[in-house]
A protein has these predicted regions:
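Pyridoxal 5′-phosphate
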Residues: 1-400
Length: 400
């Protein structure tokens, strides 16, 4: 995996059953070919043979830093500025606690009503824990900018809306926030690996994201947090675990944070997950994000056109203008849940989101025009033949 190519898709790099069209890589990316072997090797070559020594001999303890340096170019930041571990919910908590600490005199956390629930729950929980009278404001996404004022401590937003794919103008919002003296946190859950990002240029203080969506790190893959390097050493981490200490193995009784991004580490890294993510990240040496974006736009437009022509009863809820949309396309229907279940049974995997959304992730790494047309044709068949009416498609599963 060394030469870059503009050739997309790269289906050859993935293990996806050939009879399905996978439009859910925005929720769980598929495995890269060879992922299973990676997991086997960690267990049989490293853990089994070296036991505890593998923390050194197989570089286990350095995996968070190594993988953080693979994430950095994908989100447009400098090496050494990304800490890895835990889940996105926890990284969001760390960022938010730190941001509130930077603006102790202000009380408003500004998010929006389209944000992913966990981001909002984390804020609500932190507000309760701090008990200092903070308020969470959640105006509609298109009104966020006008709510930024001198009361706002932190602007805490998800760049690409998980339901509709609507994309915030990150540069404009960050600039406005900074003009008002607010700190910014961008959640890149649906952006990293999907759209070109230049987080360093935005000058945001924090960015967080997960790696099991468009970065294909596998279920439970560790999350990331970027902290602007000029402020990282003045930040008091909220979750002060031993691996964020400046010398974990000194076993000091007093917490003293690492003088680097490492202070945002907490505890023992999930090594198997890290190795899988490390392997999956190699793909970004082969492809260019601007090519990905171009291809995603082309595929999305084709899909919208095909679906609207074949299923006019479905309403597009994603922005029609590609520049305001991330890498997903969503439609609304009262029967969205049943339609998606019937579609999945017919080999086209998308997903359902409350209250009435059919959601399709467009990942050009492993999707082409034929896949888009086949997905639209299958959707048309499910709708016209009313296959979704079958009782088995009405039953709600635990994970939708
Ligand atoms: C997927 C997603 C999450 C998931 O958080 P986890 O802690 O990894 O479960 C959080 N926020 C957003 C915006 C997401 O899209």
């Amino acid at each position: 995996m060394t030469t870059r190519t503009t050739g997309l898709p790269r289906k050859d790099l993935f293990d996806i059953p050939s009879d399905i069209v996978y439009l859910d890589g925005n929720s769980l990316g598929p495995p890269l070919r060879g992922s299973a072997q990676q997991a086997v090797e960690v267990v049989s070559d490293e853990w089994e043979k070296d036991l505890i020594q593998a923390w050194n001999s197989a570089n286990w303890m350095s995996m968070p830093r190594i993988v953080g340096d693979q994430i950095a170019p994908v989100i447009g930041v400098q090496p050494g500025s990304v800490a890895m571990g835990d889940t996105l919910s926890i990284k969001a908590y760390q960022a938010l606690a730190a941001a509130l600490d930077i603006r102790p005199d202000r009380r408003v956390i500004l998010s929006d009503s389209g944000n992913f629930p966990t981001d909002l729950y984390i804020a609500q929980g932190l507000i309760d824990t701090l008990d200092r009278g903070h308020k969470l404001a959640t105006p509609p996404p298109d009104e966020v900018e006008e709510h930024i004022d001198e009361e706002v401590a932190v602007v805490y937003l998800t760049h690409v809306d998980y339901r509709t794919g609507r994309m915030h103008d990150m540069d404009a919002i960050t600039k406005r926030a900074h003009e008002c003296g607010a700190v910014t946190i961008w959640d890149l859950a649906h952006s990293a690996g999907a759209v070109p990002l230049e987080m360093r240029q935005t000058n945001t203080e924090f960015a967080v994201g997960c790696t099991y969506k468009f970065l294909n790190g596998g279920p439970g893959a560790p999350a990331f947090i970027y902290i602007r390097p000029d402020i990282v050493n003045s930040i008091r981490p909220a979750l002060t675990g031993w691996l964020g200490h400046k010398d974990p193995f000194a076993m000091d009784l007093r917490y003293d944070p690492a003088m680097s991004t490492e202070r945002f580490r907490i505890g023992t890294p999930p090594v198997v997950q890290f190795k899988l993510l490390h392997f999956a990240m190699k793909i970004w040496d082969l492809v260019d994000m601007s090519d990905i974006r171009l291809a995603a736009t082309r595929l999305s437009e084709l899909f919208i056109e095909e679906v609207e022509r074949r299923c006019p009863i479905l309403d597009l809820v994603s922005p029609r203008n590609a520049s305001n949309r991330g890498s997903q396309v969503s439609f609304a229907s009262d029967e969205a849940y049943s339609i998606i279940q019937a579609l999945i049974d017919s080999g086209v995997i998308g997903d359902f989101r409350e209250p009435n959304i059919l959601r399709f992730g467009i990942a050009p790494l492993y999707l082409d025009e034929n896949d888009m047309v086949r997905a639209a044709e299958t959707l048309e068949h499910v709708m016209k033949a009313e296959i979704w009416r079958e009782p088995k498609y009405q039953v709600k599963k635990q994970v939708t």
